[in-house]
Structures are given as structure tokens and as C-alpha cells.
């Protein structure tokens, strides 16, 4: 009797139609190993089956792009024979179930994506979304995630230099943990994943394989329910000290000519890495499962192929290089095993105890995997479904100062010192600007150059209008990178959405990608890598089912001379304060409206991409000419919040020469900056706002603003 029953198929996350495709691909019934392999390779996490046709519309090339999407990470040319290599990944579901390990292994996985390509990691970033602070589980989740990110990054010796953290009830039952790593490599020492060379040895290196993480990729492609906590065994366990050894061993071997191809074992472990390598090399692959280093007794081929144990890599070596490579990995106290070879069959064949336990043509697993053009509402129909209330009238504030105190103290704007003090941001001694500025800035060791990095997304905008929200997420990273004086070069993304089988959710995906694509084209700012995380919704809590659409963007820019870098802090008494980009008018979907009036109403602000580019290039020009002493983009909370953040950073107040309406004070119109110059300097096209000096902003003492800004995390974590 067959062991592949309809229940077994369903438990593997395959639809009846997909199972029929498996039968057609094999010309027979699969065994359990083969079914498991199809299951993980056809999961959303590995196949992008619901998003791939839309991802293909994104701009991915530019003269400085060396490698776009499709490899482990994106690669851009930063001059002088050097490249920046970077990517962003999600670890959402594991982090909700087991926050410390989920977040830690998210960091470990994205580090491997980057050093797999030959780069030494120089910076980690993150984008975190949590539910309401008063949700009974949220404090535990925040503490665990932050400790996991800090614990792993600090031990590996890669600085965590910034990120963003937001709170909203839509994430009560499904938090988001998106991790980003940036590395630097020589352009002539970049490694790819295409397995080539008939008979070349396939080598397993790193940690041993255990039973942790089995079906992690499938779990990441499913909704949450009340039983999700039972999936704790499928959360992987990370060991950052082993990862550090793995980085050093890989980079040492990469300095030789031994490696033909290399791939980390991430989602779907040995299955995904071997399939991707063989597919990219248009080859076949045969593996001897008896040779896989195992941590536990009696592991089956099914378990070995689907395990997501951490800190493991797969390589193809040149013939005769095995002994040299093994000596390097043994020196670093890591496992090393030749477990197979490259073939020309176009099949994945697995042997175990003398028998063939798997024989699958590679085409159906990868290039010919299911591809869905799922029904999506039009933007107009989506807005009708979302039913966001019109803005209507917003009463004029009777006390701008009191509103500012409340706003600067809300969870989304509160000082994040409690978070970033747990991250080692200075390891490596090249961090020039960290959390609290517009973008993190990391010097490229031994040069005058620096990379600027920013992660951004405003999910409330994306819910109200996913097209404008997608545009805005890209534009804000561009703006933040311009604000420190760097030229924005490329982005990575982490597309977090709910169930794509719902037309309204599919509309969010399609429209956000359309907006992102338009912004990238207008700003000459291509997408070079990314990740899609779907089914981010939970039936397990009362906090609403689907998350807000959250297309998190990670931007990277280049500064040729880091001496010109600007920061947000007010510098000298008497400096002139200027507004670039016009007065605020837009209160729809603003943080002010939500925090002061308890409303999430109105349209998202629109982004005029031509204005965005013009203003950003103008600010960069002024920075390069040495005319600006401080720069800050205007985003959440509008002008008064931006001024307050500059005042708190520089410990100097400001006096304003203009009367502020509520919309001018707190409106979130896009493409705007606050900048300061020396007294007497005139900025053409900018509006003079006032002067740096004193101890107040909007009539409120800096001490009161600082206390309000620092109270939330301090009181929450001590309470």
C-alpha cells in the first residue's frame, strides 16, 4: 500500500493540483524523500510561485550592478576593484515561535548569503515590526528578538549599525524580523553558485546536520494558527562562534583557486543548496547520504535533505583540491566531507545504504516549478475593500508643544537606546554613524570611502495605498542615504505580505511592486537582491489576521570621501535652519493623526519622484560643497519631530521665525529635508525656518522632550 496518502500530501503543503504535477514530472508516484523535496522546493519561500511573475517587472540593472537577483546576494561595483555585496531576508515565523533563536538564525542566514559570495561582512541592519506593546506576549517577543540579533551579531564580530522598529496591532500575532547584511569583496574574487565540471567533487562543510529546522521553509509558507507554538522544534538553533569559524575558513579557501561554486544551506537546507547549484550550472548532481556528517543517530535521507541546521555550506571544488580544502576546514575545527559529484544527467540522485532513494529531474524542482498569476483586485477595487475613512477635518492643535511631547514619546518615535545598546555597533572600528541618524555609515577599511545603509518602510501608507507605499519605501531609503552625503546605488528588499490567495492581498503585492519599480526607475536605483515572505497572518490572536503590507527596503549608497559625511545633530549656536521641499500640508495617515487623534484615516502622502530626485541631488551637492552643518530627512511625525530629533542629538534648541499650523508642524509630505548652514549663508530654493540656539523646541524645554523620548522603552522594560 502506498505511503503517499492525500493526508501526507496535504501535510507537505502541496495542493492536489500540485501533486498531479509531481506525478507527471516523475512519471510515477514519489517516495517520501521525493515528496519532501518537491514540498520544500515548491514552497513560496523557495519557489516564489505567487510573486515571481511580478518580480520580473522590477528594474535590476545599471552600469554599476555586477550581479542582480538570482544569486545568494546582490553585487555592486564601488570602484577601486571593490564590490559591495548585500541582501535582506526574513525570519518572521520562527521569531514569533522562538524569538531568540528565530532572530539569531535570521542574522546567521543572511551573513552566510553574503560571505558565500566572497565578501567579508562589514555591517548588519534590521527591520522589526511588533504588535501592541500592551499585548501580553509582546514584551517577551521584543526582548527575545533584540537579544537574539545582538547575541549572534556580537559573537560573530559583525557590527549591527542600525535599522527600524515599529509597533502596530496588525503584528500582534505575526511579528516581522527582517535582517540585512552588507559585505565588501574584491571584484575579481566574487563566487557564484553554478555547479559545473563533470565529476567535480561536491563538498559539505561547517556544522553537522541535526533534526532542527525540518520543514522550516514550509512553515515559512503557511498561515499561523493556535498550534504554531507546537512547531518550536522546527526553529533552527544557531551557533555564532561556529559561524565565525565558517566565515574565516571560507574566506581562507576563497583566497586559493580551489572553489568552482559555493552555496549556503539556508531554507530547505541540503535540498535547496544542491538543487540551486545544479540548476544554475545546467548540470546534474549525485549525493551519497551515508557521507553527510550527522549530529544525531539514525537520521534518514528525508531528515538529512530537509534539515535546516545552521552554519553549513555546500561547495564544488576543482579535482585534486580536496586535501588542501579539508586541511583548512579541519584547522578551523569544522566538518568537511566529500558527499557527491557533479553529473550531466540533469537529475538529482540520492544514494543511501546502497540504494537509490531519490531520482528527480531538476527542471520541475526549479525552473519549471509552479508559477501562479493569482487574481488581484485593481487599485480602485482594493481601496474600496480597504475602506480607509476619508481624512475629513482635523482640528487645529491648541498646543503644538504638548502634542509634540506626546508624539516624540510614542512607541514608533521613542528613543531606541534600549535596543541598540544591546548591539555591538563598533566592532571592527569602521562604524562612522550608527542608530539614530538617517543612515548608518561604515568606512571601507583602509580607504577614504564609506557605505551608507538605510532600511525603510511605512506600512500604514502601504495599507491605505500600496502603490504609493511601495514608492515611498524606496524613496525614503534614497532620501536617508542622500541625507548623510552618499550617492544611493541600489536596494535589496524583503516583501512581507499575508495570504496571496486572497485577491485583496495579491493587490497589495502587485501594487507595491509597481510603486517600487517606478521609484527605482525614476531614481536610477536598481533592485539587486531580495526575499518574499507570504502568509504573514495569524488565526491565533485577537489582534487581527493579516499584517499590514510591509515591503521593507534596504538601500546602499557610496561616499567617496567620508570626511564630508553629515549627521542630524544641530552643531553651533546661531546656525541657520532651512527647509528643503516646501511646507507640510498632508495629515492623512500621519503619525500625528494616529497618536493624537486615534485615527488611521485619509490617503497616504504621494511621492513626486522627479521632486524626490531633484531635492536629494541638491542636498548632496550642498553637502559635497561643505555648505551644510546638519541634515535630517522629514518622515514620521513631520517637521517638528525632525527638528526635535536634531535638537536632542546636538543638545541645542532652536527658535523658529515662522508660525506653524498643525499640518505644517506634523504633516508628512514627502521629499523634504531640514538642513542647517552657518549664519549668513543663503540656500537658493530653500525656506528659512529659524536659528539654532537656546534650550527649547516649540516652547518645550529639551529636558522635557528628552525625558518623553526616553521614557517608553525604559519604563516598559523595567515595568
Swiss-Prot record:
Judging by the UniProt lineage, the source's domain of life is Bacteria
Keywords carried by this UniProt record: ATP-binding, Cytoplasm, Ligase, Magnesium, Metal-binding, Nucleotide-binding, Purine biosynthesis
The protein's annotated pathway: Purine metabolism; IMP biosynthesis via de novo pathway; 5-amino-1-(5-phospho-D-ribosyl)imidazole from N(2)-formyl-N(1)-(5-phospho-D-ribosyl)glycinamide: step 1/2
Residues annotated as catalytic: 45, 91
Query: Any idea which positions bind Mg(2+) 2?
Result: 113, 264
The record's HAMAP family line, in alphabetical order, gives: PurL_2
The molecular function terms of the Gene Ontology recorded here are: ATP binding; magnesium ion binding; phosphoribosylformylglycinamidine synthase activity
Native organism: Novosphingobium aromaticivorans (strain ATCC 700278 / DSM 12444 / CCUG 56034 / CIP 105152 / NBRC 16084 / F199)
Q: Which family does it belong to?
A: Belongs to the FGAMS family.
GO cellular component terms listed in the entry, alphabetical order = cytoplasm
Q: Which SUPFAM superfamilies match?
A: PurM C-terminal domain-like, PurM N-terminal domain-like
Chain sites annotated for binding substrate? 90-93, 112, 236, 308-310, 533
Q: Which GO terms describe its biological process?
A: 'de novo' IMP biosynthetic process
Complexes and interactors: Monomer. Part of the FGAM synthase complex composed of 1 PurL, 1 PurQ and 2 PurS subunits.
Which InterPro entries does this one have?
Answer: PRibForGlyAmidine_synth_PurL, PurL_linker, PurM-like_C_dom, PurM-like_C_sf, PurM-like_N, PurM-like_N_sf
Question: What is the reaction catalyzed?
Answer: N(2)-formyl-N(1)-(5-phospho-beta-D-ribosyl)glycinamide + L-glutamine + ATP + H2O = 2-formamido-N(1)-(5-O-phospho-beta-D-ribosyl)acetamidine + L-glutamate + ADP + phosphate + H(+)
- Residues binding ATP are 48, 87, 493, 530
Q: Please report the name of this protein according to its UniProt entry.
A: Phosphoribosylformylglycinamidine synthase subunit PurL
- Indicate where this protein resides in the cell: Cytoplasm
Keyword hit for Cytoplasm: yes
The protein's job, in short, is: Part of the phosphoribosylformylglycinamidine synthase complex involved in the purines biosynthetic pathway. Catalyzes the ATP-dependent conversion of formylglycinamide ribonucleotide (FGAR) and glutamine to yield formylglycinamidine ribonucleotide (FGAM) and glutamate. The FGAM synthase complex is composed of three subunits. PurQ produces an ammonia molecule by converting glutamine to glutamate. PurL transfers the ammonia molecule to FGAR to form FGAM in an ATP-dependent manner.
Amino acid at each position: 500500500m502506498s505511503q503517499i496518502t492525500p493526508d501526507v500530501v496535504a501535510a507537505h503543503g502541496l495542493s492536489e493540483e500540485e501533486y498531479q504535477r509531481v506525478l507527471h514530472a516523475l512519471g510515477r508516484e514519489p517516495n517520501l524523500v521525493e515528496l519532501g523535496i518537491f514540498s520544500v522546493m515548491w514552497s513560496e519561500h523557495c519557489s516564489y510561485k505567487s510573486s515571481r511573475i511580478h518580480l520580473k517587472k522590477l528594474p535590476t540593472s545599471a552600469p554599476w550592478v555586477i550581479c542582480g537577483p538570482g544569486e545568494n546576494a546582490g553585487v555592486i561595483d564601488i570602484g577601486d576593484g571593490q564590490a559591495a555585496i548585500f541582501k535582506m531576508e526574513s525570519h518572521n515565523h520562527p521569531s514569533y515561535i522562538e524569538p531568540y533563536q528565530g532572530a539569531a538564525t535570521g542574522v546567521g542566514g543572511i551573513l552566510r548569503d553574503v560571505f558565500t559570495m566572497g565578501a567579508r561582512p562589514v555591517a548588519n541592519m534590521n527591520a522589526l515590526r511588533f504588535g501592541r506593546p500592551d499585548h501580553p506576549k509582546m514584551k517577551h517577543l521584543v526582548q527575545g528578538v533584540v537579544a537574539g540579533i545582538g547575541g549572534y551579531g556580537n559573537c560573530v564580530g559583525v557590527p549591527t549599525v542600525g535599522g527600524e522598529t515599529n509597533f502596530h496591532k496588525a503584528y500582534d500575532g505575526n511579528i516581522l524580523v527582517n535582517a540585512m547584511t552588507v559585505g565588501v569583496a574584491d571584484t575579481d574574487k566574487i563566487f557564484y553558485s553554478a555547479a559545473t565540471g563533470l565529476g567535480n567533487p561536491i563538498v559539505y562543510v561547517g556544522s553537522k546536520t541535526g533534526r532542527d529546522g525540518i520543514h522550516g521553509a514550509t512553515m515559512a509558507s503557511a498561515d499561523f494558527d493556535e498550534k504554531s507554538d507546537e512547531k518550536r522544534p522546527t526553529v533552527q538553533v544557531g551557533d555564532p562562534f561556529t559561524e565565525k569559524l565558517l566565515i574565516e575558513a571560507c574566506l581562507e579557501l576563497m583566497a586559493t583557486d580551489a572553489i568552482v561554486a559555493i552555496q549556503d544551506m539556508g531554507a530547505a537546507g541540503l535540498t535547496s543548496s544542491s538543487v540551486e547549484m545544479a540548476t544554475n550550472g545546467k548540470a546534474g548532481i549525485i549525493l551519497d547520504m551515508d557521507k553527510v556528517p550527522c549530529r544525531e543517530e539514525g537520521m534518514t535521507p528525508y531528515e538529512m535533505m530537509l534539515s535546516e541546521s545552521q552554519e553549513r555550506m555546500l561547495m564544488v571544488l576543482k579535482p585534486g583540491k580536496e586535501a588542501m580544502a579539508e586541511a583548512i576546514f579541519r584547522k578551523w575545527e569544522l566538518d568537511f566531507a566529500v558527499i557527491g559529484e557533479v553529473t550531466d544527467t540533469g537529475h538529482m540522485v540520492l544514494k543511501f545504504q546502497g540504494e537509490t532513494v531519490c531520482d528527480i529531474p531538476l527542471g520541475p524542482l526549479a525552473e519549471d516549478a509552479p508559477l501562479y498569476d493569482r487574481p488581484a483586485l485593481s487599485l480602485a477595487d482594493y481601496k474600496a475593500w480597504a475602506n480607509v475613512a476619508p481624512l475629513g477635518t482635523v482640528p487645529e492643535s491648541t498646543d503644538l508643544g504638548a502634542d509634540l511631547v506626546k508624539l516624540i514619546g510614542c512607541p514608533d518615535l521613542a528613543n531606541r537606546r534600549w535596543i541598540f545598546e544591546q548591539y555591538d555597533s563598533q566592532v571592527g572600528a569602521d562604524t562612522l554613524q550608527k542608530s539614530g541618524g538617517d543612515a548608518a555609515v561604515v568606512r571601507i577599511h583602509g580607504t577614504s570611502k564609506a557605505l551608507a545603509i538605510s532600511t525603510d518602510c511605512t506600512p500604514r501608507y502601504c495599507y491605505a495605498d500600496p502603490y504609493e507605499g511601495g514608492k515611498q519605501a524606496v524613496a525614503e531609503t534614497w532620501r536617508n542615504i542622500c541625507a548623510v552625503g552618499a550617492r544611493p546605488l541600489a536596494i535589496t528588499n524583503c516583501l512581507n505580505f499575508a495570504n496571496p490567495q486572497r485577491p485583496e492581498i495579491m493587490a497589495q503585492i502587485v501594487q507595491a511592486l509597481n510603486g517600487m519599480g517606478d521609484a527605482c526607475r525614476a531614481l536610477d536605483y536598481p533592485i539587486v537582491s531580495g526575499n518574499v515572505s507570504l502568509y504573514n497572518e495569524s488565526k491565533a490572536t485577537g489582534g487581527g489576521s493579516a499584517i499590514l503590507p510591509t515591503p521593507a527596503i534596504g538601500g546602499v549608497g557610496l561616499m567617496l570621501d567620508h570626511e564630508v559625511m553629515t549627521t542630524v545633530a544641530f552643531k553651533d549656536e546661531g546656525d541657520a535652519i532651512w527647509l528643503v521641499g516646501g511646507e507640510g500640508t498632508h495629515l492623512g495617515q500621519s503619525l500625528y493623526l494616529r497618536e493624537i487623534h486615534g485615527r488611521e484615516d485619509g490617503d497616504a502622502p504621494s511621492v513626486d519622484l522627479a521632486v524626490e530626485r531633484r531635492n536629494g541631488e541638491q542636498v548632496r551637492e550642498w553637502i559635497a560643497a561643505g555648505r551644510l552643518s546638519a541634515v535630517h530627512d522629514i518622515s514620521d511625525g513631520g517637521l517638528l519631530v525632525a527638528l526635535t530629533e536634531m535638537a536632542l542629538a546636538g543638545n541645542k534648541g532652536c527658535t523658529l521665525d515662522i508660525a506653524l499650523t498643525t499640518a505644517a508642524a506634523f504633516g508628512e509630505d514627502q521629499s523634504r529635508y531640514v538642513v542647517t548652514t552657518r549664519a549668513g549663508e543663503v540656500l537658493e530654493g530653500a525656506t528659512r525656518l529659524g536659528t539654532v540656539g537656546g534650550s527649547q523646541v516649540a516652547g518645550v524645554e529639551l529636558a522635557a522632550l528628552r525625558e518623553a523620548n526616553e521614557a517608553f522603552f525604559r519604563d516598559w522594560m523595567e515595568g
